[in-house]
Amino acid sequence: KAAEHGISIILDGVFNHCGADSKYFNKFSNYSEPGAVQQVGSAYDKWFTFHEDGTYESWWGVDALPTIVSDNPDYQEFICGENGVIRTWLRRGARGWRLDVADEISDSFIQKIRAAALAERSDAVIIGEVWEDASNKRAYGKLRQYLEGSELDGPMNYTLRKSILSFLMNEAGAESTALALEELWENYPHEAFYSCLNVFGTHDKERLINVVAGAPTPDSLSAHEQVTYRLSADQ
């Protein structure tokens, strides 16, 4: 239906970690099939890293988000195989994928994701969550290959967001802003430059109106308004 209205659906692929309550980890035994927590030798136990004290690797130490061993061959087949996650959802009508925390999945895995997507539909698009200049990004000591033709069509353009907002907030002048934008133009391949996901507000950043106009102080809001703006720790 979306395609009939000229709308393309880009799905958010989180392939570096999952929820502790997912069927794969099943920390709370909410699923009948044994997850990695319930049974050594389960279909998913090699997808995660457990320590002798019962703890496990998790995304930035958040135990609700166990880290997936994303270079595990079985996991990569689950994601990139003919009937894997990537191809199944493209087959159902999605147009592409946005890769969450691209810095934390390997170049080789991203290459497999892209290959799987293009095998399903030749016009599939792969966007990566990269917060800096994606042409020369170093992550965990390694120079990434995002824009060399076999991984991302383009990144989320947080670099553009930073430059524009710095100018609007009078934190940067016109000349330095122009130079920052020109640097992107020079660094990015032509195709990648025009395939960026340009954003000013996302679930990871402040709302644009709050940045430009200023967020209200908590004391200026009624209890009801506070709830609609930001929940307190107790709430």
What is the predicted function of each stretch?
Residues 1, 61-78, 94-104, 163-174, ...:
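The substrate-binding groove and active-site-proximal loops of carbohydrate-active enzymes
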Residues 3, 17, 26-33, 85, ...:
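Active-site-proximal helices and loops of the catalytic beta/alpha 8
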Residues 38-39, 76, 111, 145, ...:
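Residue-identity detector for glutamine
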Residues 44-47, 160-164, 235:
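A short, hydrophobic secondary-structure junction motif
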Residues 203-206:
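Extended catalytic-interface subdomain
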Residues 212-219:
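Conserved, charged catalytic cores of large soluble enzymes
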